[in-house]
Amino acid sequence: MTERIPPELQTQLVKLQQLQDQLNRLLTEKNVIDSELREVNKILQELSQLPAGTTVYKIVGNLLVKTDKETVQKELDDRKEILELRSRTYQKQENLLRTQLEDLQKKVNELLAKYYPQSGGAIKA
């Protein structure tokens, strides 16, 4: 005979799973942003080694467009600023989610101890 999970515990477990899923999605998005930021920094480093007024090419869709170094550098500096802001925002969200997860894990552990005292009632995320 299987034992039913108490509704209160079941609700908290669902919330815990949702928070974990949300954190995983956020970390994936943050990794994409951080990867793009590293790429932009690398390109800016390469551009800094070129003399002023140098002609460079950039890819726009399926086209290779001729432009000057300063224009590309300005575009990349703007992009870098946006990416850094997004990365900081994701970091704050990650910290908040991790705190919420810890709090909810404690609550779930308390409920497990309440409903299943013989098993010790602790889980790890």
Curated annotation (Swiss-Prot):
It is found in: Cytoplasm. One of its GO terms (molecular function) is protein-folding chaperone binding. Pfam families: Prefoldin_2. GO terms for biological process: chaperone-mediated protein complex assembly; protein folding. SUPFAM superfamilies: Prefoldin. Keywords: Chaperone, Cytoplasm. GO terms for cellular component: cytoplasm; prefoldin complex. The keyword Cytoplasm applies. Heterohexamer of two alpha and four beta subunits. Molecular chaperone capable of stabilizing a range of proteins. Seems to fulfill an ATP-independent, HSP70-like function in archaeal de novo protein folding. Belongs to the prefoldin subunit beta family. This is Prefoldin subunit beta. It comes from Sulfurisphaera tokodaii (strain DSM 16993 / JCM 10545 / NBRC 100140 / 7) (Sulfolobus tokodaii). The lineage of its organism: Archaea, Thermoproteota, Thermoprotei, Sulfolobales, Sulfolobaceae. The gene is pfdB.
